[in-house]
């Protein structure tokens, strides 16, 4: 039996694994390293600053800057990095700091009837663990507007479904949303020869400003301090005090989660986006049907009640993610129903050390944002999460059977990667 099984091998899962390995826990981590990051279009860039994009290890030895140095690249403030570079950084981090990683996906996490958990991989093998850390990223929580749900994938996709976008050249594509994913997707589609329109409920597009220099004098730094979430005192509170955020009333946390750090494009994207000529704001999709010639007819409604019709070849919904337990299908249905939730929302309530209301089940990443605040929507939150979560695991192990974990050997090398058996 493992002390800890980690489900997910993105920034949060890898960071938790690095801390758990350093503490000698007998652990196993399942997932394909940085899979969703590797699947992004190569023309996309990291929105966050390099110094706010580190994965977490106990010694701080394997930050993004350390990886950049091995590549002869300077990770500089105010200079965006390609998402492919960040994905490769995650791979490197795993080789340096994480013990043997099992690349199979997990299909089920369920109580084992003996106080622990049964974790089942995609090939049917089941392993047992005293504790589990669920770090499944954002993909299970994709949000698509109601009228578009259930339509064929040839007509409607989420922005996260796409790697390269060159297959849309010459086609009419409607992108729904007003955040970074929508604006960058629209810009890339335009660059690659698609006819693109943006359709958004927002009345205006918001753009982040060019970040001020890190060294700008005491007074300017005091007025608007830098944080991993952007400049300003409100962002500093979100970035530095997730533990205090967790103590707020549930309704307050839900409201802040829904409103803080709203949709906005990166400052460096604005010039690229200027090529997108058809931008329709203050409108929402109220209906959608497939036409006789296999296109999509969208009924749109304005804020003033006006209505209109858009015909398009394809819709890409860049409409974010909703951290609802009902979408965490990897958890057994009975286990999902057992977990306490934040207020009236569907997100799980998370304790002081990232433990859910079910002893031994720990959560990381987006699922914890309604408990710990906006930091958990970003890679930046992994630094706060990983060490505390592993502390919680160690406390739970001591409170349980009292059986200690085995000693993890040296961090794995690329040759130690565990893969699924051939079928």
Q: Model regions: which residues?
A:
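Flavin (FAD/FMN) cofactor-binding and adjacent substrate-gating region
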Residues: 39-72, 226-246
């Amino acid at each position: 039996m493992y002390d800890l099984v980690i489900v997910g091998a993105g920034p949060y899962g890898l960071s938790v694994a690095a801390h758990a390995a350093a503490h000698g826990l007998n652990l196993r981590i399942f997932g394909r390293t940085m899979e969703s990051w590797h699947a992004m279009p190569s023309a996309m860039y990291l929105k966050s600053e390099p110094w706010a994009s580190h994965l977490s290890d106990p010694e701080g030895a394997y930050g993004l800057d350390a990886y950049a140095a091995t590549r002869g690249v300077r990770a500089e403030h105010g200079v965006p990095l390609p998402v492919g570079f960040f994905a490769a950084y995650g791979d490197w981090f795993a080789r340096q700091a994480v013990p043997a990683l099992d690349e199979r996906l997990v299909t089920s996490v369920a109580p084992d009837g003996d106080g622990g958990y049964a974790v089942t991989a995609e090939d049917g093998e089941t392993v047992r663990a005293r504790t589990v850390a669920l770090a499944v990223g954002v993909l299970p929580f994709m949000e698509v507007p109601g009228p578009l749900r259930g339509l064929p994938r040839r007509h409607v996709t989420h922005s996260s479904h796409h790697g390269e976008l060159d297959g849309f050249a010459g086609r009419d594509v409607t992108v729904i949303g007003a955040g970074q994913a929508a604006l960058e997707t629209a810009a890339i589609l335009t660059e690659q020869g698609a006819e693109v329109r943006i359709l958004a409920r927002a009345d205006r597009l918001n753009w982040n400003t060019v970040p001020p220099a890190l060294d700008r004098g005491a007074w300017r730094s005091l007025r608007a301090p830098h944080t991993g979430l952007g400049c300003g005192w409100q962002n500093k509170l979100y970035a530095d005090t997730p533990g205090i955020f967790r103590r707020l009333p549930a309704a307050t946390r839900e409201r802040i989660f829904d409103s803080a750090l709203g949709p906005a494009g990166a400052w460096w994207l604005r010039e690229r986006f200027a090529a997108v000529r058809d931008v329709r704001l203050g409108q929402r999709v109220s209906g959608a049907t497939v036409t006789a010639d296999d296109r999509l007819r969208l009924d749109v409604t304005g804020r003033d009640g006006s209505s209109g019709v858009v015909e398009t070849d394809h819709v890409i919904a860049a409409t974010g993610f909703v951290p609802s337990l009902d979408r965490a299908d990897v958890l057994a249905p009975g286990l999902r129903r057992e977990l306490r939730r934040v207020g009236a929302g569907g997100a799980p309530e998370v304790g002081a050390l990232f433990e859910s209301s079910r002893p031994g089940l720990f959560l990381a990443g987006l699922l914890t944002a309604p408990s710990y605040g906006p930091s958990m929507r970003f890679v930046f939150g992994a630094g706060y999460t990983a060490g505390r979560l592993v502390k919680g695991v160690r406390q739970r192990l001591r409170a349980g059977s009292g059986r200690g974990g085995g000693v993890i050997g040296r961090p794995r090398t690329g040759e130690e990667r565990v893969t699924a058996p051939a079928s």
